[in-house]
Amino acid sequence: MGSEFGLANLRSVQSGGREMKRQGGGNNTKTPSRFWRWKMVVQSLEGVGSVQSSIDVAANPHSEDNSSPKKRRVSSRLQVKQKPQKELLVRQRVELLDDNEQGPRKKQANVRGRQTGEVADSEELPKATDSVEKSDRVRVKETLRLFNKHYLYFVQEEEKRAVKAEAQKKASRAAKRGAKKSKKGDLKKADTKVAKRPDLKALTKMNDEKEILFPSKRFGSIPGIDVGHQFYSRAEMVAVGFHSHWLNGIDYMGQSYSKGKYSNYTMPLAVAIVISGMYEDDLDNAEEVVYTGQGGHNLTGDKRQFRDQVLERGNLALKNCVEQDVPVRVVRGHDCKSSYCGKIYTYDGLYKVVKYWAEKGISGFTVFKYRLKRLEGQPLLTTNQVQFINGRVPQSISEIRGLVCEDITGGLEDIAIPATNLVDDPPVAPTGYTYCKSIQVAKNVKLPTDATGCNCKGSCVDSKTCECAKLNGSDFPYVHRDGGRLIEAKDVVFECGPKCGCGPSCVNRTSQRGLKYRFEVFRTPMKGWAVRSWDFIPAGAPVCEYVGILRRTEDVDSASENYYIFDIDCLQTMKGLDGRERRSQAVCIPTVNSLERPDDHRSDNVPEYCIDAGSNGNIARFINHSCEPNLFVQCVLSSHHDIKLARVMLFAADNIPPLQELTYDYGYALDSVLGPDGKVKKMFCHCGAAGCRKRLF
């Protein structure tokens, strides 16, 4: 996929939603000059959270170096002012040093401009360069996103196989009843077998394509994976090279590692273990663990031992760790309904194997025991890292601290969205807007007629015959799992519309079903209002639509203090204008009048339409910027096929645990914002991400 979405541009924020106001941190924050028009372009699924390809970030949260997206276009109202600096600015980048390349700390920037969020002319800021280095943290996130993409692809393949097998089964039953005769061998043996798990197929593909992040095993910590990192399956650990076995509890180096830099060690040696209650003899006292060796127990039943364990392979590897003083990575598994495997795995840090022995286990068979002690000086697992496992998520609105509004939607949404404020004194609720559930259309905007739909009945299942599937590149963009998940980002997603023969349960209507997660709007000290979910959100799941008033861009008053304008620039992205990279997931664009007008070139550089959420909007207006966001933007077409009027949807870029703030990258080009005096404006970023670029623009 391309490195940038470029699907929509955002202009700043006022009282309710964007970080533009929040940089000052408080109700008294001064709104930026009303003559400004800021542009923000959202990154792609591959780059949204970790800022890929054209923009990479360092894992060190204290770094004063910055990174910025590729220089992007701005609105026509700013082009004249920016023209003298354009050629210079388009080449500028901010250098980011990786952990191993971190230079001397720069002097802390003067923050006298914090009340407005702007940077004073005298303040020292990092200089822009062309050097950008990708951090280990970013590489881990990219790899997990790649795994999720492969996983969802094979989920779709399994769904197809199941549909085909069910059809063959029905045909076979009909033949037996004499309804019709089927030829011998109609029911293929391959279709009657249990399919290989999609996650294991994804790992096989990643291994074949050499996409495993750290394919060679190593002692100690894995770069980019800190204590508290959570994996939503054993397969995710394999994908990044953290633990190379999707089933065994002990990962170890075999004899093949006895050469080279490990020639002084006696192999095998253990590198990681998983504690997840697989053995009846395990004892766990947090800082000290008695771990039972592997082998001889019932994997699929009650986990009881049925034969003696043998001191070989993983068991021998842990014994050798005692004798050679080699620490192992310890991962703790917890039951979690949100994970497709029923568990979630949290990295607890490095442990030293201090002792081993053999004894008769509870079931009467010989087992090997290992005493492990946690190494000192490591960060502890904090409450916010495990709170969703231990039930800290509020079960009802009455349990919320700092409640200032029980439902900001006024009952319009099926699920109430409360607002909380533990920052202001006295606490205040979000104001200055009217909540609306769906797009409102300005009087002078005429929507296209409904597009001709597919002829599917009930639900679309056959991508070869469904006309909507063909528009998406001959297959459906979603899978059924978890209520519908987008496999990967596309230039635009074509969903089934009002003239299609399928019903509301069709998988190709996934983004049309409204909000399905329990959200909360909460006040932050530095960024104003923010949004989080009480529920786990899987990668690829639709989160919400950006809702407001659909207007012509030329009708937006440049002098008004409205900073919730979201330009619909899907067409500009698809045409690759202004140096934007096009995605590999090309789609078939239907011929519509709006794309054939002879004067179409006039709107190539500036989108014709925008969504104004200033006075009317939904929960999306409260979602903040982050340099490492967990959401991405996707243009969607359903009722019509005019790309210039596409719906703007926010999807989960990662598996998002409960209570984690929802964010996406506003995508400013560095030094792209000019004030009324023609000078470049600068603003600090307070997103708090480890790879924060320090400047919003």
List each model region and its residues:
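Compact mixed alphabeta submodule
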Residues: S338-S396, I656
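Acidic, glycine-rich low-complexity segments with interspersed aromatic residues
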Residues: V111, Q115-L146, H150-T346, N444-P448, ...
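Catalytic cores of histone-lysine modification enzymes
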Residues: R509-S639, K644, D654
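Intrinsically disordered, low-complexity acidic/polar tracts
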Residues: K373-E376, L381-G483
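Extended, intrinsically disordered, low-complexity regulatory segments of metazoan chromatin-modifying
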Residues: G2-L125
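C-terminal interaction modules of eukaryotic adaptor/scaffold proteins
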Residues: L650, P658, L662-F697
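Short, Lys/Arg- and Gly-enriched loop/turn segments at beta-strand edges
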Residues: K337-I344, L550-D557, L670-K681
